Design a protein with these regions (language model features):
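Conserved N-terminal alpha-helix of the aminotransferase class I/II PLP-enzyme fold
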Residues: 34, 39-91, 113-121
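Conserved C-terminal alpha-helix-loop-beta "cap" of PLP-dependent enzymes
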Residues: 296, 304, 311, 315-381
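A broad, low-specificity signal marking well-ordered, structured residues that form hydrophobic/aromatic
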Residues: 10, 29, 54, 283, ...
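Conserved PLP-enzyme active-site core in the AAT-like
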Residues: 2, 11-13, 17, 79-313
Length: 381
């Protein structure tokens, strides 16, 4: 689809043409586990990647394909892969590059679930994560060594709301021929396309603002198509892959080489571990995308107004919101974000833990739950 189309048009149209059989304008939900092969040769061509098409819904599904193409267009990427959750998206992005003995360098201001995965789970598989303070990009350079295979950051840190200098971190990573993986959940492509600033891989928990209504769980990985995986340090891409017919993903894909990362993720981690998204959840996230631009604009406005209100409240001791001009993240966020500063506000109240619990327990309109990105306001402590 034309790259000249506006963001809101891509939200509605990217990745889809009316169904050729039924002429349905809306995206159908394809509830099927598998697909009929036209012939033995057709099946062989699909498995050998001579032809791309549907084999089994653990690998791909037509509803899922529209979602992937639409998000890839919104992020400015070459291809995308939708998965069962944001957590599985991050995990697959890492194990698609790293094996036992490898390392990644990560910002330390991460969502708690990601931090636990990096600090406790990945080491069990022999993958070491070095955590650094992302406020000084040179910290990444100091932590990189010959075992490093990737650099990981979040656009806006969860929950501290610090904004990372994406381009500076990307420059350092690329000097060492390393890919940058950016979790853009808190910004979505409406606020920033991280690929435009040097990200090689973008991950997003669609459960949050992309879905926008708290009705489904899903994640997505977007491949910029710009990173060269032929460097021998990326042995998973350069050595014959025993789990998929001995293919060398950095060398044997022909015209598909630019999307080697996503193809390998689909054919190795997803095919063999199975964290696939359901067609119904894919369809729900497509509904969310249709209003993403409208919701994010209003959510950012409401968050800024809330932050200003809290800033002047006598019982509030501090407020973090990247859109406040005196916030430590404002100078950096203002450089990158042109459509708003996000939909989250973090603050502290006087009186310590007891006061915090009393505040949470007396909420009326706001819901107390473990999620973010819902259309309905929520609070979490």
């Amino acid at each position: 689809m034309s790259q000249n189309l506006k963001f809101e048009t891509l939200c509605l149209h990217a990745g889809q043409e009316p169904d050729p059989k039924t002429l349905s304008r809306a995206v159908p939900i394809y509830r099927t586990s598998s697909y009929v092969f036209k012939s033995s040769k057709h099946a062989a061509d699909l498995f050998s990647l001579k032809e791309l098409g549907n084999i089994y819904t653990r690998l791909m599904n037509p509803t899922q394909a529209v979602l992937e193409d639409r998000i890839a267009a919104l992020e400015g990427g070459a291809a995308a892969l939708a998965l069962a959750s944001g957590t599985s998206a991050i995990y697959y992005a890492i194990i698609n590059i790293c094996a036992a003995g490898d390392e990644i360098v990560s910002a330390n201001n991460l969502y708690g679930g990601t931090y636990t995965m990096f600090n406790s789970i990945l080491p069990q598989f022999g993958i070491r994560v070095k955590f650094v303070d992302p406020r000084e990009p040179e910290n990444f350079a100091k932590a990189i060594n010959e075992k490093t295979k990737a650099v990981f950051i979040e656009t806006i840190g969860n929950p501290g709301l610090e904004f990372t200098d994406i381009a500076a971190v990307a420059d350092i990573a690329h000097q060492h021929h390393l890919p940058v993986i950016v979790d853009a959940t808190f910004t979505t492509p409406y606020l920033i396309r991280a690929i435009d600033h040097g990200a090689d891989i973008v991950v997003n928990s669609m459960t949050k603002w992309i879905g926008g209504h708290g009705t489904g769980i899903g994640g997505v990985v977007i491949d910029s198509g710009k990173f060269d995986w032929k460097n021998p340090k990326f042995r998973l891409f350069n050595e014959p892959d025993g789990s998929y017919f001995g293919i060398r993903f950095a060398h044997d894909l022909g015209d598909l080489n630019p999307i080697a990362f996503i193809l390998r993720m689909r054919l190795v981690p997803l095919r063999n571990l199975g964290a696939c998204i359901s067609p119904d959840n894919a369809w729900m996230f497509l509904q969310g995308l249709e209003t993403l631009h409208l919701r994010m604009e209003r959510l950012c406005h409401n968050a800024k107004q809330t932050a200003r209100f809290l800033k002047n409240h006598p019982k509030v001791t501090w407020v973090r919101y990247p859109g406040l001009e005196d916030d430590p993240s404002f100078p950096m966020a203002n450089r990158y974000l042109k459509n708003g500063f996000g939909a989250m506000v973090v603050f502290g109240i006087s009186g310590g833990r007891n006061a915090g619990e009393k505040f949470i327990d007396n909420l009326a309109l706001f819901s107390h739950l473990a999620n973010v990105g819902d259309a309905k306001s929520l609070a979490l402590h």
